[in-house]
Amino acid sequence: MPVVTVFEQHAQHYDDWFDGHESVYQAEVAALRKFVPATGLGIEVGVGTGRFAVPLGVEFGIDPSRRMLQKARRRGLSVCQAVGERLPVRDAQFDLVLLVTVICFVDDVPTLFRELRRVLKRDGQLVIGFINRDSELGRSYESRKEASMFYRDARFYSVAEVADWVKEAGFGSLRFCETLFGGPTEFSARGLEVREGYSDGAFVVLCTRNT
C-alpha cells in the first residue's frame, strides 16, 4: 500500500506541516467544530498524528500507519492500527465518527461509508472534512499531485460525488460548511472564514446522521 508507506516514512514531515501552516490548520479545525458534538463517544478514522482529534475532543482513533499512531498516542489518544473499511469495532459503538482528508486515500469509499454507518449508534453523527476537487485549491492539487509527497496517489472528489456515496450508504439529510477560499499559495483573512453550505471553498465539511 504505497499511501501507507509514504505516511509511515514521513510521519514527522506530515506532523510539522501543521505548525508551518497554522492559519490554514485552525480554519479547518473551526469548520469541523461547527458539526462535531461537544459530548458523546467519538472516533477519528484516519487519525494520523492526532492533530484534529485532540482539539475537537475525540478520544479514539484508528490509522494504518504505526508511526503516525505513535505520535497520536503521545498526544493522549487511545489508538488502534486498522483501516476504515474493516474496523475492529462492534456495531453501534460511537456517537461520532470523524474523517479529515481521508477519503482521497481510500481504495473503496462506498465500502468505507457503509462500515462507518455500522459502528455508529442510531442518530450518531458522521463528520467528513475533505478537499473539494472543484475548488481553486483542489484543481491546483490535482494538477500538481505527481510532484507531491503525500498527494501523489490521492483521488480528489467533488462535493456531489461524496454526497451521493453518503446517501447510498443509508445516512440521513446532509449539512455543509466550508473554508479556504482562493489560494493555493496563500489565504487572506476572508479566505479563512467558515461559511455555511458549499460553493468554492477548498475544505468542505459534510455532516449527517445515522438514521
Predicted feature locations:
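Class I SAM-dependent methyltransferase SAM/SAH-binding core
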Residues: I43-R86
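C-terminal lobe and adjacent flexible extensions of AdoMet/dcAdoMet transferase-like proteins
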Residues: A202-T211
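Short catalytic micro-motifs in class I SAM-dependent methyltransferases
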Residues: T101-C104
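Short alpha-helix
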Residues: A154-G170, L174-F176
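A short glycine-rich, Lys/Arg-flanked "PGG" loop and its adjoining helix->strand segment in the class I
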Residues: P110-R122
